A protein has these predicted regions:
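Hydrophobic transmembrane alpha-helical segments in integral membrane proteins
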Residues: 1-25
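Hydrophobic cores of alpha-helical transmembrane segments in multi-pass inner/ER membrane proteins
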Residues: 20-30, 77-91, 138-150, 183-199
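Membrane-interfacial loop-to-transmembrane alpha-helix junctions, especially the N-terminal start
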Residues: 40-50, 99-106, 151-162
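Membrane-proximal helix-loop-helix units in multi-pass membrane proteins
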Residues: 68-145
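Internal/C-terminal transmembrane anchor helices
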Residues: 211-234
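Conserved small/polar residues in nucleotide/adenosyl-binding loops
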Residues: 244-248
């Protein structure tokens, strides 16, 4: 755990000006997608997301977090997502068109990366040894929000990668004492339902076994089970923090 937090501190101390620039670029591009969703803006967002995932792979994991175990594997994970966005730039699968989903939840996910440092400060942490907006889980939350707000067609590879990363984030809640990462895990439950509900609705006319109504019911059940699991994890973390506070 000491290595984990030391690498975060070194990363934040060395890259905080770049992180501010990245957050500003993300905000500008997101606003442009709402106000002026031209093809150039959409391509710029895909390039930005490819670069952002590459930043996490190279700068975060390989340069500043190389001391951690399996950092090369995690760098490969984010590198693959960067390649997927670059391929999407060529294939134009993700159109970044406004969806019929409520944008309130997407807006909440946009703001969650900014909440990461606030949660760290509330826990008594201080800069640079704290979570920041340009870290793996906060980037994943922002990407999920973007896809919920703008993507009609689901890029299933990105969805699977991001959901898998949410499970990794949940593990970090236990092993590294980062309750902030529960934000990503918790946001995945409604996001999963919204993603796959639309997929089921689009294929409602197809004859499948089970049928669309049964699939929707199974999806709701799955999300409830995952939500209960995440809730149990959060309660366990709160109990551990309470025991630590009492012992002090």
């Amino acid at each position: 755990m000491e290595i984990f937090w030391n690498t975060i501190a070194r990363y934040n101390a060395a890259t905080w000006p770049w992180q501010i620039a990245i957050v500003a670029a993300a905000a500008v591009l997101t606003v442009l997608l709402y106000l002026r969703p031209t093809q150039n803006v959409k391509r710029a967002m895909k390039l930005f997301l490819a670069g952002l995932n590459a930043w996490i792979a190279v700068v975060y994991y390989l340069v500043w977090c190389g001391q951690r175990s399996h950092s090369d594997v995690l760098a490969l994970f984010w590198g693959i997502m960067a390649v997927i966005w670059l391929y999407d730039l060529y294939a134009d699968f993700t159109r970044f068109e406004r969806t019929s989903r409520p944008n309130g939840f997407a807006l909440l996910l946009y703001l969650m990366p900014l909440a990461y440092p606030l949660f760290s400060l509330a826990r008594g942490l201080s800069f640079p040894m704290m979570t920041m907006p340009v870290m793996p889980c906060s980037v994943a939350v922002f990407t999920i929000g973007l896809m919920l707000a703008f993507t009609h067609r689901i890029n299933i590879f990105l969805v699977l990668f991001l959901c898998h990363w949410a499970l990794i984030g949940l593990a970090k809640v236990y092993f590294f004492g980062i309750p902030e990462d529960f934000l990503l895990a918790a946001s995945t439950v409604p996001a999963l339902y919204l993603f796959f509900r639309e997929y089921i609705a689009k294929n409602r006319e197809l004859r499948t076994k089970p049928d669309a109504r049964m699939l929707n019911g199974l999806l709701i059940l799955l999300c409830i089970v995952i939500g209960l699991f995440f809730t149990a994890t959060l309660l366990h973390q709160i109990r551990l923090l309470s025991l630590i506070h009492i012992s002090e």
